[in-house]
Regions:
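Mg2+-dependent phosphoryl-transfer active-site scaffold
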Residues: 1-187
Length: 188
């Protein structure tokens, strides 16, 4: 089974203090380091020198281990409580705010792409999800293309040109972008 589970937190350290876990191992050109966000919450052999699993996370997956990514998302620091979160998440964002470069630069995941945002004008969750996918190397050839062209192949899974985002990740990120737009607008 291949699964990719990401869970967002305002402060991942809080959950990691509560959950028994072993940081995932990442190897690159023979160099070992702890994975930035991935942990195993089940027993897995430990490398005490590097303080992470003794099996690379990709190999561990083939052996049936399950890595979970606990991600820090500072956007959640702007949320006051559950009711506020529900309200901000349910609200349709003012997508036109993204046309203002200083505003767009503050928005999570897309702040470095203000010119492309202005050109392509993502104005819905599906379009924002596709936009997030095409700023990854594997789908960069779809930048500045009409939305019809983008949607014809953005979710085809072809990663021959580089790293691609899965549709589920892109939609989740798009929802976070929408939430962040609403939270930033509320602060103005």
């Amino acid at each position: 089974m291949s699964a990719d589970v990401d869970i967002d937190f305002a402060d991942r350290k809080q959950i990691l203090e509560l959950v028994k876990h072993i940081p995932a191992r990442q190897e690159n050109n023979g160099e070992v380091r702890r994975h930035n966000s991935g942990v195993f919450v089940t027993d897995i052999p430990l490398d005490p020198i590097h303080e992470c699993s003794s099996i690379n996370y990709r190999e561990a997956e083939t052996r049936g281990y399950f890595k979970i990514d606990f991600l820090n998302q500072s956007v959640y620091e702007l949320v006051k409580d559950q009711a506020h979160y529900d309200c901000m998440l349910a609200k349709e964002p003012n997508w036109n705010l993204l046309l203002d470069a200083p505003f767009c630069e503050r928005v999570v995941h897309i702040g470095n792409y203000t010119d492309l945002v202005k050109e392509m004008r993502p104005d819905s969750i599906p379009r924002m999800a596709a936009f997030i996918a095409i700023i990854r190397p594997g789908k960069a050839h779809l930048q500045r293309q009409p939305w019809e062209t983008v949607f014809a192949s953005v979710w085809d899974g072809d990663d021959s040109k580089g790293f691609v985002f899965k549709k589920s990740h892109s939609i989740s990120y798009a929802r976070l972008v929408a939430l962040h737009i609403n939270l930033l607008e509320e602060q103005q």
